Amino acid sequence: FVITSDMGLCGGYNANVYRMIQDEFSAQDHVVMVGVRGAAWISKRNYNVENVLSDLDEDDVYNALSKCMQDALDLFEKKEISKIQILYTHYKNTLTFVPTLETVLPVSKPQEEKKSGMHADMIFEPDKETMLQNMIPMVTKSILYSRYLESKTSEQASRRMAMESATDNAEELQDNLELAYNRV
């Protein structure tokens, strides 16, 4: 999954994502593009685009993303794809957002924690495997939606900064032109 913007005027937001696509993806990788700008960009390149989600209705975003994630999970379960990754823009603060590639599946094994003196045997009902089969789709869909929202936050912050910079430049140009006019 690659999450880009639906609108322009957001500075280098999309360019940073495109650069990471070129660095991290090959032509054989299955790609799901989320966002109008990314779909337009990738259509001119040699990538294996499985699906394009653009101009998503705000009320139906989760359902659309959920359906795509379920399709990816089905491919993963059939071993047609080896991993599911999300390329999104991680929001740190208003000025900092970083393109990030996160592997959702397969899940990496957590590092062993030191054993404490207490150990409790857990009884799972239903059994662990059934619980995992039910939880994995729920968790992966939630992760995708969360990354989508984080990317949208980054997009808006980037757009705000670009517009603020454009306004500052326009005011500076106006001041310079006013000075030049008054000298004449």
Q: What are these regions, as identified by a protein language model?
A:
Residues F1-V184:
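C-terminal beta-strand-loop-alpha-helix "lid" module of Rossmann-like NAD(P)-dependent dehydrogenases
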